Amino acid sequence: AQGYRDANILADTIINNQKGNLDIHIKLEEGHKYYFGNISWKGNTKYSDSVLNMLLAIKKGDPYNLETLNKRVGKELSMEGGDIGSLYQDDGYLFFQADPVEISVYNDTIDYEIRLREGPQATYDRITVSGNNKTKDYVILRELRTIPGNKYRRDDIIRTQRELSQLGFLDPEKIVPQIVPNADAGTVDINWQVEEKSADQLELSAGFGGGIGLTGTLGVTFNNFSIKNIGKKATWDPLPSGDGQKVSARIQSNGKAFRSYNFSFTEPWLGGKKRNSFTIGYSNTK
């Protein structure tokens, strides 16, 4: 990271000291400190040298750091973005490749030529989901931004992961896009591997006060409800589920002085084609 390209470990020794700890002695050879020289581009037709240089953000005279160079050109897919690979992949270039090549080393300076293979723009082909046992496929598929026929974009993958995790009934850490590119056809298949989690919520509190009697609150919320499966007892676990609907019921009592009942049902995709939330509720206070 500090420009010591030829740094090398010559020897290492581990010694048990008198205190029962381990002392580690490492003998290093730093070598010369190197700096970036001229950086040129080859194979870029979509973006100009000036645009790529701006994103690369490495100037002549900066300390040599191969890890930084590989990260800036996007040798591997980055979730954070801001690198050259992300620039291409957000415009459909799934098959983009970048290969930084040393073309000259003189004194303490290294010149690079960054060779790009842009490839064709890819489109989504087969999009599937797996791992969902209760949740219907369509409930997950309607949330996806990776729509068959559309141009591939890295940002679609990232936003879909984030939005699926916000549903509440999928484990955010187990949402994995399994990407299968087909370079010959210029397409990409994606299987969204998911794992469900319990999303139901229970609220319970109770107390007793002199003069007012028993007080308390009981509330339940089901976040992956299915109203159309109410009549199908075989689907109850413990209630009908799988359509991504939300049902909430809450009872609150303050002894004889106050009682309230609240019930609500929410359909997040009324009509099924656009995200259009519909909620109906009932409330009664005595």
Regions found by a protein language model. Name each.
Residues 1-167, 171-172, 179-190, 194, ...:
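Interaction-mediating elements
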Residues 10, 46-51, 153-286:
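Gram-negative/organellar outer-membrane beta-barrel architecture
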